[in-house]
Amino acid sequence: MLVIDPYKTWQTLAERLETETNPLHRRQLEQIIEHMKGEAAGDIDRILTTVSPKATYISYDNPIGPPRVFRGHDEIRQFYDQMLAAISVNLEYFVERLVVDDYYVVTEGVSKSAVKGAALSAMGVKVDDPNAYYLAQGRNVVIWPFDRDGMIMGECIYPGAGSAPADIAGRKLRPEEIGTYEEAA
């Protein structure tokens, strides 16, 4: 049984797309779905085709310090390189709430990721297998601004309460519990 299902990441957006009649909103949903599929494939170049070269990512994942800010494609590539160094590309972000307007899309839901044991070890957390993956989960809100050309202008990422690293180390995942994304042939 899958614990992490990457296909759930864009499920809510695809369902909304089926009934959305506003052409601008449809384009925004399509861009985010393509973006999410690029993330699921671990294809940074594909992700960047959906993101304006002027985009800014802001991650509020450090509760005691300033947010991490990544401007432009080169820095956004660094953001994804850092992320993929710590977790499996196969992650799930099940969107429970979705707001779409002419300038922004807001997604809120539960994220699950498979953290590399080696990444936990690097944080000083004891794991029984540095080559295994461990389950992290939490709630996230992502604000997706758009430019006039329909390109994503960045992500403002607000992670809510999530798994503490020591708790993650107690949730070792079996390979068959981590779903993988593959394009339809």
Where are the regions that the model predicts?
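A short, structured loop/turn motif at beta-sheet edges
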Residues: L98-V105, P145-M153
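Low-complexity, intrinsically disordered terminal/linker segments enriched in charged
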Residues: L2-E15, N131-A132, A136, M151-A185
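A solvent-exposed, acidic/Ser-Thr-rich amphipathic alpha-helical stretch
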Residues: I44-A119
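Short solvent-exposed loop/turn micro-motifs enriched in small/polar/acidic residues
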Residues: E30, V89-L91, A136-G138
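Charged, low-complexity C-terminal accessory regions
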Residues: E15, L24, V141-R148, A161
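Exposed beta-sheet edge and beta->alpha loop/turn motif
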Residues: G109-R148
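Hydrophobic/aromatic beta-strand elements that line small-molecule binding cavities or substrate pockets
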Residues: Y93-L98, R139-P145, I157-P159
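Short, low-complexity N-terminal intrinsically disordered segments enriched in polar/charged residues
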Residues: M1-T49, P53, A184
